[in-house]
Amino acid sequence: MGDVRLSALSTLNYRNLAPGTLNFPEGVTGIYGENGAGKTNLLEAAYLALTGQTDAPRIEQLIQAGETEAYVRADLQQGGSLSIQEVGLGRGRRQLKVDGVRARTGDLPRGGAVWIRPEDSELVFGPPSGRRAYLDSLLSRLSARYGEQLSRYERTVSQRNAALRGGEEWAMHVWDDVLLKLGTEIMLFRRRALTRLDELAREANAQLGSRKTLALTLTESTSPETYAADLRGRRAEELARGSTVTGPHRDDLLLTLGDFPASDYASRGEGRTVALALRRAELELLREKFGEDPVLLLDDFTAELDPHRRQYLLDLAASVPQAIVTGTELAPGAALTLRAQAGRFTPVADEEMQAEGTA
């Protein structure tokens, strides 16, 4: 059917964005402006509308101050067909619709979008929870079943923790049976997917000019073979702590650069390169799985990057069917350029671009 294209994005009461609709062409759309002008919020809204996912700790953070609801809508074209994806946001809730019908995240186009941003360095230097979230987000898009089983697993862990806090040791065998089934499936899926993700990230890291080999491995708190024994063996500890201490929710995605963990030994520049390699691997894995390119969302293409890596990102944006690139500078080669000011985005004429470029 061809690649999915974002033809228009509409927002209402979303962070600092002015209400309205922006139309996007194929190719690169460049958005430039000062920090705080709304560029990142626009990409966040696009990513939410395209994938149904957000990493905001609370939904309320996405809603403008003084408002109780927010709304984003993506008009998508694929081949000759048009589809509309909507996300309604309220206090503690998120509602998805596809062509007016309520939907789940798994019902959205699986490729969707890949969002590259300066904060991705936290994938390298931040806590294990961020790396798990990266992996789970990607795998949920590769497999709707993975996302469903992960949600069931997380609910089960929460319910089991409540039973542990209540001292309900008698109920553990019931929860353990459910955990074993769900957790084992999650671990096995992660292992299979990581084989290819590791290969792609290694290639991307080399293309970015790193002379150190990147490797991705799972640091697991248990294994499918020992899971049942580990749950039984740590029962007393879990009752004392009131929480489930073993399972895939405690795993880490270990990033090794050369012979050492990147989180401990990589420089800031090396960490940024590793993060870019992860996002490039994400894009390639989605492309391989679904046979189409995600929309590339590239936030602040000049941030913390040397000229080689900056050009790498610009070349990547030019190589995909559609990309939205933001920065404090003009993005070269854009089919459309928008200026961001106080949450509003206005087209920039060729004459203005030439003046900006020589200023």
Swiss-Prot record:
GO cellular component: cytoplasm
Single GO molecular function: ATP binding
Chain residues that bind ATP: G33, E34, N35, G36, A37, G38, K39, T40
Keywords: ATP-binding, Cytoplasm, DNA damage, DNA repair, DNA replication, DNA-binding, Nucleotide-binding, SOS response
Pfam families according to UniProt: SMC_N (PF02463)
UniProt subcellular location: Cytoplasm
SUPFAM superfamilies from the UniProt entry: P-loop containing nucleoside triphosphate hydrolases
Main location: cytoplasm
Domain of life the protein comes from: Bacteria
Record-level GO BP terms: DNA replication; DNA synthesis involved in DNA repair; double-strand break repair; SOS response
Free-text function comment from the UniProt entry: The RecF protein is involved in DNA metabolism; it is required for DNA replication and normal SOS inducibility. RecF binds preferentially to single-stranded, linear DNA. It also seems to bind ATP.
NCBIfam families: PRK14079.1, recf
PANTHER family: DNA REPLICATION AND REPAIR PROTEIN RECF (PTHR32182:SF0)
HAMAP family found in the cross-reference section: RecF (MF_00365)
Protein family: Belongs to the RecF family.
Listed name of the protein: DNA replication and repair protein RecF
Taxon lineage: Bacteria, Thermotogati, Deinococcota, Deinococci, Deinococcales
